[in-house]
Amino acid sequence: MIGHLTGRLVEKHPPEILLDVQGVGYELLLPMTSFYQLPDIGQQTALFTHLVVREDAHLLFGFSQKTDRTLFRELIKTNGVGPKLALAILSAMSVEEFAYAIEREELSKLVKIPGVGKKTAERLLVELKGKFKGIQQEDFFIESQHLKQPEHALNEQDIPASEAISALIALGYKAAEAEKLVKKISKPALSSEQLIREALKAAL
């Protein structure tokens, strides 16, 4: 299994990137929490990876931190949670925020993540509660954090806004919902990555 890759960043189309590793191009899907930390195109970057093998495709997921990959692996062990939903969860919350929500049994926060209904959220609470406390600090670190919600508007005609909307749709949001979230952000100078970050915060 491919566990780690270091190479030159060739393309960035959230949540997907193309990484050149010694002449071989690897397509990876990243949660937005990892995507935000990527360098500029042409720069070197290193990612922890997890390979998902399906009958119709081999999907490679990348993570900036080992803790993100650890949580991803825990999530896909949960009944009813596949790689796409795990990616959406990690895009909506940091590891610390998710662990805190689980330990505090914040069902209302979990159901706001696209693709997570009440039954799935309840299953996550049952299957993951308590797992974070016994894991070493280098794997998980729980702290109290609450997301701030922006309350402004944005011109949807901006190219970064269009890219942000496309990325949110890829993460499981409906088109109308993605557009509404991006419109709430009032800073047209923001990059697509910044817009995605703020939109995901607003969704929670």
Swiss-Prot record:
Region ranges (Domain I): 1-64
Domains: entry comment: Has three domains with a flexible linker between the domains II and III and assumes an 'L' shape. Domain III is highly mobile and contacts RuvB.
Role summary: The RuvA-RuvB-RuvC complex processes Holliday junction (HJ) DNA during genetic recombination and DNA repair, while the RuvA-RuvB complex plays an important role in the rescue of blocked DNA replication forks via replication fork reversal (RFR). RuvA specifically binds to HJ cruciform DNA, conferring on it an open structure. The RuvB hexamer acts as an ATP-dependent pump, pulling dsDNA into and through the RuvAB complex. HJ branch migration allows RuvC to scan DNA until it finds its consensus sequence, where it cleaves and resolves the cruciform DNA.
Source species of the chain: Pasteurella multocida (strain Pm70)
Superkingdom, natural source: Bacteria
Stretch list, region Flexible linker: 144-155
Name this polypeptide is given: Holliday junction branch migration complex subunit RuvA
Region (Domain III): 156-204
Single Gene Ontology MF annotation: four-way junction helicase activity
Primary residence: cytoplasm
